[in-house]
Curated annotation (Swiss-Prot):
This is Alpha-glucan phosphorylase, H isozyme. It is found in: Cytoplasm. Its EC number is 2.4.1.1. The modification N6-(pyridoxal phosphate)lysine is found at K688. It comes from Vicia faba. Its cofactor is pyridoxal 5'-phosphate. InterPro entries: Glycg_phsphrylas, Glyco_trans_35, Pyridoxal_P_attach_site.
Length: 842
């Protein structure tokens, strides 16, 4: 092959052998694939020519896979251009892709051939895939959902694209020190990404600031300000065992050479010479920059508008390219569906109006008809702080033309209410888009989405019911058919087939087919074998292997030895008070205290447990960071306690991301989804755990409700208040009627005793005290749910001691997870919201 590889830090020298200057993108035989890898190592060089170590091998391997993807990608693009189907464009501020190599060769069904090819270099596929860094383009469930959706769109052969931003440093890389969480820049692009292709011919101008000029004919034009260029980077998204390969187009911000002032530079005014270049770099530097200052708010708003404007200019350009003029704009909604993933891309609405009116010459009514038939909105939260509201003065400063359009949409909506719904006059102030509060006038982005979109959907049945009965109830009375539910889903390719191959092989063996990978409903066939001893033995063996793999990972990243014979109990998600990691760790603290009080003989009768918690706390979210610190401090004490550490260990898993999840989820046995009822829109990690035969302890919140229905109530450890009880319980708390459980008080007192160190946890614990007030009054009902949570944990211990019962419950969990495929979700979006159809590449 021309290469000799050493993986133990040796020279890894290149040996002399001629490599033909020709690649075969469609190679499937190991010898041909190995030749392709050699070709890229020599003719697509990124490193010194006389070394071929693991990183070089990874990049050469990835580029050989990319060749094949580009071939399919081009065929897909040309086929879509020829057929000209209606196409969906999915706009999201986040795409949490994870590693691409395993996913690509898995979807292309060439993983075995690649494994054999790499062995010819003395390499294992797994050690090559470990070289890839996760693309830092997202943070949590919002971005991961978007990525699952892209996988399903491609697999279902749907004409669709994703649009996002190419963040240089992501959200942040999380480091855990004695001081708690520290944030450093994520360096995923330190070298480069072999999966993206820069499109130097796809460049759009994006204007900020400036003023609006009224032309003699009454038309309006946005002029002046500063103009940044949006440059496209394309990432191929292959479908599973299909030629269809769609695009995730990411935008990078850049300034032109003309914006560099050579005179100032040569005059020594170095920073002033490149002001616009610096501002352009800031736009895509990090995901969700801090917005405590006006500068931070402007930057976040710039990011959102940059995504919307670049994407819509690109969409319009493609519409024109396929229609080849003259263009009938009334046909635009029959060819284009724009889906807003939460409120971040809301500016797509006024931007599409602006482009149609100011650039294409449409009148208001025609532009509004096109826009309102094109755009649909997915709501992901009922949390007040997550329903975006932008300062009107900031909006006027940055986007003056858009504020004019938003004002007009608001004016017309208020007029509609006044004319047709006098019964809603008392509600108008809350329903309208503009909140003109003199102290703090804002634009309500969710309201703008609801008024302007043809469809609004929630992401779990409970969440959608809350949207219709509470958050958007007044709108429902005007547009009852506008609101839908689309329960979220996950891609079974990444989340079981690739991340847990042992389990996948067992499922295929017992179902006698592998078609479940694209038809997850077939998993119900496992139910008849739930009591089968042979299946249970195989099930247990595969779980054991995954637990050992997880234990090795934890040792590698934390230095902590954990026992694979203990119950692996995991909660991994963004750190937030409503997700109640605090409830989890308080339960752990109470368990630790009780273990300390037991005799050695009594401890032997308990269920040994390893509790793992992971997730990032936003840098400015103080209480969330205190929770991270508390978990780590508890772990330091518990894990070094020789009396207890054989029965309980606590680990904070740092820098949680997709690749970490692919190790944690298959190795888990119990998963905690314990948010305050009514506050989690859906959640998708619960689906990933349930699919991977992990039992759930949780509240009746989000998708937990539907998971429990599907897998069977007896296979779900339920606790806590229900969503309809929460308002009453908060009111009772305000009125001083809450009486805390003694166990809850005991756990808090134990923290305050200083046993976990000298850090001041009083501000965190104070949030659980009192009856009302900012940062007090236990808004998330940790104290109320604590006793039922502890009771449910006792039931977990009891069930785990009965191995046959636990295995049966585990099998039934996987068997009941068929509903939660993103293929099902996307098929429903395609039929019921987007009105698009399959467009398979022949």
């Amino acid at each position: 092959m021309g290469f000799k590889v050493e993986t133990n830090g040796g020279d890894g020298s290149l040996v002399s052998a001629k490599v033909p200057p020709l690649a075969n993108p469609l190679a499937e035989k190991p010898d041909e694939i190995a030749s392709n890898i050699s070709y890229h190592a020599q003719y697509t060089p990124h490193f010194s020519p006389f070394k071929f170590q693991l990183q070089q091998a990874y990049y050469a391997t990835a580029e050989s896979v990319r060749d094949r993807l580009i071939q399919q990608w081009n065929e897909t693009y040309l086929h879509f251009h020829k057929v000209d189907p209606k196409q969906t464009y999915y706009l999201s501020m986040e795409f949490l892709q994870g590693r691409a190599l395993t996913n690509a060769i898995g979807n292309l069904n060439i993983q075995d051939a690649y494994a054999d090819a790499l062995r010819k270099f003395g390499l294992e596929l797994e050690e090559i895939t470990e070289q890839e860094k996760d693309a830092a383009l997202g943070n949590g469930g919002l971005g991961r959902l978007a990525s699952c959706f892209l996988d399903s769109m491609a697999t279902l052969n749907l004409p669709a694209w994703g649009y996002g931003l190419r963040y240089r440093y992501g959200l942040f890389k999380q480091i855990i020190t004695k001081e708690g969480q520290e944030e450093v820049a994520e360096d995923w692009l330190e070298k480069f990404s072999p999966w993206e292709i820069v499109r130097h011919d796809v460049l759009y101008p994006i204007r900020f600031f400036g003023q609006v000029e009224v032309n003699p004919d009454g038309s309006r034009q946005w002029i002046g300000g500063e103009v940044i260029q949006a440059l496209a980077y394309d990432v191929p998204i292959p479908g599973y065992q299909t030629k269809n390969t769609i695009s995730l187009r990411l935008w990078e911000a850049k300034a032109c050479a003309d914006d560099f002032d050579l005179f100032l530079f040569n005059d020594g005014q170095l920073e002033s010479a490149s002001v616009l270049h610096s501002r352009a770099q800031q736009i895509c530097s990090v995901l969700y920059p801090g917005d405590a200052t006006e500068g931070g708010k402007l930057l976040r708003l710039k990011q959102q508008y940059f995504l919307c404007s670049a994407s819509l200019q690109d969409i319009i350009s493609r519409f024109k390219e396929r229609r080849q003029g003259p263009w009938n704009w009334s046909e635009f909604p029959t060819k284009v569906a724009v889906q807003l993933n939460d409120t971040h891309p809301t500016l797509s609405i006024p931007e599409l109006m602006r482009l149609l009116m100011d650039d294409e010459g449409l009148g208001w009514d025609e532009a509004w008809a096109v826009t309102s038939k094109t755009v649909a909105y997915t709501n992901h939260t009922v949390l007040p702080e997550a329903l975006e509201k932008w300062s009107q003065p900031v909006m006027w400063k940055l986007l003056p033309r858009h504020m004019e359009i938003i004002e007009e949409i608001d004016r017309r909506f208020v007029a509609l209410i006044s004319k047709t719904r006098l019964d809603l006059e008392d509600e108008v102030s809350n329903m309208r888009i503009l909140d003109n509060n003199l102290q703090k006038p804002v634009v309500r982005m969710a309201n703008l989405c609801v008024v302007s979109s043809h469809t609004v959907n929630g992401v779990a049945q409970l969440h959608s019911d809350i949207l219709k009965s509470e958050l958007f109830a007044s709108y429902v009375s005007i547009w009852p058919t506008k609101f839908q539910n689309k329960t979220n889903g996950i891609t079974p390719r990444r989340w079981i087939n690739f991340c847990s191959p042992e389990l996948s092989r067992i499922i295929t063996k017992w179902l006698k087919t592998d078609k479940w990978v694209t038809n997850l409903d077939l998993l119900t066939g496992l139910r008849e074998f739930a009591d089968n001893e042979d299946l249970q033995a195989e099930w247990l063996s595969a779980k054991r292997a995954n637990k050992q793999r997880l234990a090795q990972y934890v040792l590698q990243v934390t230095g902590e030895n954990i026992d694979p014979d203990s119950l692996f109990d995991i909660q991994v998600k963004r750190i937030h008070e409503y997700k109640r990691q605090l409830l989890n760790i308080l339960g752990v603290i109470y368990r630790y205290k009780k273990l300390k009080e037991m005799s050695p003989e009594e401890r032997k009768s308990t269920t040994a447990r390893t509790v793992m918690i992971g997730g990032k706390a936003f840098a400015t979210y103080t209480n969330a960071k205190r929770i991270v610190k508390l978990v780590d401090d508890v772990g330091s004490v518990v894990n070094s306690d020789p009396e207890v550490n054989s029965y309980l260990k606590v680990v904070f898993v740092p820098n949680y991301n997709v690749s970490v999840a692919e190790v944690l989820i298959p190795g888990s046995e119990l998963s905690q989804h314990i948010s305050t009822a009514g506050m989690e829109a859906s959640g998708t990690s619960n689906m990933k755990f349930a699919l991977n035969r992990v039992l759930i302890i949780g509240t009746l919140d989000g998708a937990n409700v539907e998971i429990r229905e599907e897998i069977g109530e007896e296979n779900f450890f339920l606790f806590g208040a229900t969503a309809d009880e929460v308002p009453r319980l908060r009111k009772e708390r305000e009125n001083g009627l809450f009486k805390p459980d003694p166990r809850f008080e005991e756990a808090k007192k134990f923290i305050r005793s200083g046993v976990f160190g000298s850090y001041d946890y009083n501000p965190l614990l104070d949030s659980l005290e009192g009856n009302s007030g900012y940062g007090r009054g236990d808004y998330f009902l940790v104290g109320y749910d604590f006793p039922s949570y502890m009771d449910a944990q006792e039931k977990v211990d009891e069930a785990y001691r009965d191995k046959k019962r636990w295995l049966k419950m585990s099998i039934l969990s996987t068997a009941g997870s068929g509903k939660f495929s993103s293929d099902r979700t996307i098929a429903q979006y395609a039929k019921e919201i987007w009105n698009i159809e399959e467009c398979r590449v022949p």
